[in-house]
A protein has these predicted regions:
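Sec-dependent signal peptide recognition
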Residues: 22-29
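N-terminal signal peptide c-region/cleavage motif recognized by signal peptidases
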Residues: 35-36
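Cleft-lining beta-strand/loop regions that shape enzyme active-site pockets
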Residues: 41-49, 53-70, 123-127, 131-140, ...
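Glycine-biased strand-turn-strand hairpin within the trypsin-fold
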Residues: 42-55, 61-63, 69, 86-112, ...
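Extended, small/polar residue-biased N-terminal targeting/export presequences
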Residues: 64-123, 171-173, 177-187, 195-197, ...
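Acidic, polar loop-rich interaction surfaces within structured domains
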Residues: 303, 311, 318-321, 326-328, ...
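Conserved functional hotspot residues or short segments at active or partner-binding sites
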Residues: 349, 354-430
Length: 430
């Protein structure tokens, strides 16, 4: 999850002075400046460690088999330092930082997958709806072992992303390991990824809200969807909020999405290293669906912001959680701009209202429902000619075609079918 914060700037040393000292001395001063009143012993140990860094740095510069630039070495050193802390901390150079800003705005180029590092490989957290990766059959939990034949063992996320992104239309072959199956190749054509984070449908008088990611457009899109459904001639009797394969996104969006369904109470608390570093986010009065039954669908690809929403609504007994245990990412990152790049740093863990961390544990569903294929529901949430506001009617149809589509959808997506049945049951009991 990203705590969006593009405004911080840190000036470490005046520019003229930087020209007079070596890169190593700059790093040494950096470490000393960020230390809070170090003791003499701490300072001495810091200098000792930096002298080791200096020796290694000079050895690499003088003797490595290929020539490397200072910029390249320093970027790799910074990334190594941060990624050794946890998989979600990293250094972003100017190019990567710009790409990250595009990602959170909702339009970018690539394959359409959220990835992390795990066991030396690249793990797919989830494919994004209606993207080349999702259409090619990539699944949450898949491991990527090769990119165009190049092994990804111990490859950084940045290096993997650099390979996966390229010219629109150019193909890339990724080698996948899925469960106990033998590795297999999938060819995917790169495309511009335009994420419509919220889609909606009414199925059997139940509103189905699909959120694929949490970007700057998510809460606005969710509210518009609910307003449209509630304002229809036959409003839904209840809702299914589908967060399956949603890798997360912006913290503030997870808070405002949760608030759409809550009247009051804590949504999430963010706790940093110090006891005083606690921030609590609470709901404002106003449930947009007026207490109607709500089922939330999750799976192992539901992470971060998805888990905040599911956890908050579960702890307040506002929704029943169905599906499979979620991913278990309970940490918060902040983005700190430095020069033309930025540092992504884990600064806190988040806790649902219960106070129990979900880090590496995940959200446990109230009702466990086995995995279901998502290709049917994802392809169903696409626009057709009939979706246009002023589309011409076909006088020869009687509506049975749409009913058949719904039936086929529910037959192929067992989790969604169970969720819709649950909404109907709760509505009757209420």
């Amino acid at each position: 999850m990203i705590w969006k914060n593009y405004g911080q700037r840190t000036l470490l040393m005046p520019a003229p002075l930087l020209k007079k000292i070596s890169m190593l001395k700059y790093i040494s001063v950096f470490f000393l400046l960020i230390s809070s009143q170090p003791s003499f012993a701490d300072t001495k140990e810091t200098y000792r460690q930096l002298s080791i860094f200096n020796e290694v740095y000079n050895r690499v510069k003088d003797q490595y088999v290929e020539e490397v630039t200072d910029k390249e070495l320093i970027e790799k050193a910074l990334n190594g330092m941060l990624q050794a802390l946890d998989p979600h901390s990293s250094y972003m150079n100017e190019e990567v930082y710009k790409e990250m800003q595009i990602d959170t705005s909702g339009s970018f180029g690539g394959l359409g997958i959220e990835i992390t590092t795990d066991k030396g490989f690249i793990k797919i957290v989830s494919p994004i709806d209606d993207t080349p990766a999702q259409k090619a059959g990539v699944q949450a939990g898949d491991y990527i072992t090769h990119l165009d034949g190049t092994s990804v063992v111990d490859m950084t996320l940045k290096e993997a992303i650099d390979i996966m992104r390229g010219e629109v239309g150019d193909p890339i072959t990724i080698t996948i390991v899925r469960g106990t199956e033998r590795p297999f190749d999938i060819e995917i054509k790169r495309d511009v990824i335009k994420v419509q984070s919220v889609k909606h449908r009414i199925i059997n008088n139940v509103g189905v809200l699909r959120i694929s990611t949490f970007n700057e457009q998510t809460t606005v899109g969710l509210k518009k969807s609910i307003e449209e459904l509630e304002g229809s001639e036959n409003p839904p009797i209840g809702y299914v909020l589908d967060l399956r394969n949603n890798p997360g996104g912006l913290l503030n969006e997870s808070v405002t999405v949760s608030d759409v369904f809550l009247q009051k109470g804590e949504i999430v608390s963010i706790r940093g290293r110090e006891k005083k570093d606690v921030q609590v986010f609470s709901a404002k009065k106003g449930d947009m669906i007026n207490g109607k039954p709500l089922i939330i669908l999750i799976n192992e690809g539901s992470a971060s912001a998805s888990e905040i929403v599911a956890g908050a609504l579960q702890d307040h007994d506002r929704a029943v959680i169905m599906g499979i245990k979620s991913f278990g990412k309970g940490s918060v990152q902040t983005i700190v701009p430095i020069d033309s790049g930025a540092v992504r740093l884990t600064i806190a863990k988040y806790y649902p209202p219960s106070g129990d961390s979900i880090q590496a544990v995940g959200i446990i569903p109230d009702v466990e429902v086995p995995r279901a294929e998502l290709n049917v529901i994802d392809s169903y949430f696409t626009f057709r000619e009939s979706d246009y506001r002023d589309a011409l009617d076909n006088e020869t149809t009687d509506g049975n075609e749409e009913e058949e589509d719904f039936n086929e959808l529910l037959e192929n997506d067992y989790q969604l079918s169970r969720a819709i049945d649950a909404v109907k049951t709760i509505a009757v009991l209420n």
